[in-house]
Amino acid sequence: SEDERPVGIQIYGRDLDAMVEAAKIVEEARPDVIDLNFGCPVKKVAGKGAGAGMLRNIPLMLEITREVVKAVKIPVTVKTRLGWDCNNIIITELAEQLQDCGIQALTIHGRTRSQMYTGEADWTLIGEVKNNPRIHIPIIGNGDIKTPEQAREAFNRYGVDAVMVGRATFGCPWIFKEMKEYIFRMENTCIKDGAEQQSSSLSSLPSPLSTFSPLTLDDKIDILEEQLRINVERIDEYRGILHTRRHLASSPIFKGIPDFRQTRIAMLRAETVADLTAILEECRVRLKPDKQ
């Protein structure tokens, strides 16, 4: 819906003509941006030369980027990684090359393809790209952003224009609201104290302080149930549940449930909306403190 904009659609591939055609098809859906995925590290993608596999074929990556930019009228962005492995860290030069291709923003995950999701994301290199005087497009940092505090540090320490949150959203779709509220609250405090620390990338956004209220446990379970309903309505019950149940089973709000392992297994095996909803309602009861 229009309320959910801006909306981006991400595509990946290694065939030039197919990528251009895919971008044209995607443009018909009227997204606000088309993102080219040159960062997915999984074997079934990168092993075939797509996603992060493009980091081993920079000329083709740049050609695809240039041609997609020329083929569509909406903004094109790119997401990629630092390089293929620790011996091939190329992001500083690559960022300039991609910018020259005409992209409107660049998202950098702070690991190489070989690292997959192991170790820690190297935000120092992301910061170096952002602070490169030759870079004028927005730089979006990605990797290990799990808390509001980490998100704010990324803005203040590395100067990025935005942060992208990935795995931390599993079972926690409210994380964006919590991060946004925390950042604005802290920046507002700094301003009141006379500190000139407000990030320019945040100053133009409307403040949520007047409308934000902390989410209760009931609120969060309601949101998870809504997420389940929306996914089923937009796809179908079978695939909607497949997409949703692993997110629900990963939710951090259930860590307070004793012996949650069996409940988690039940979530991952649930096949109907009714089954999953019943499990969530059981969790709601089990998480509430005993009444004296």
What residues fall within each predicted segment?
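Short, solvent-exposed beta-strand edge segments and adjacent coil->beta transition regions
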Residues: 4-8, 49, 264
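Conserved strand-turn element in the central/C-terminal portion of the radical SAM core barrel
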Residues: 5-16, 75-85, 140-141
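Short, flexible micro-motifs
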Residues: 16, 42, 52-54, 86, ...
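Alpha/beta enzyme core
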Residues: 20-50, 59-137
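Alpha/beta catalytic cores of nucleotide-metabolism and tRNA/nucleoside-modifying enzymes
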Residues: 71-73, 87-105, 117, 124, ...
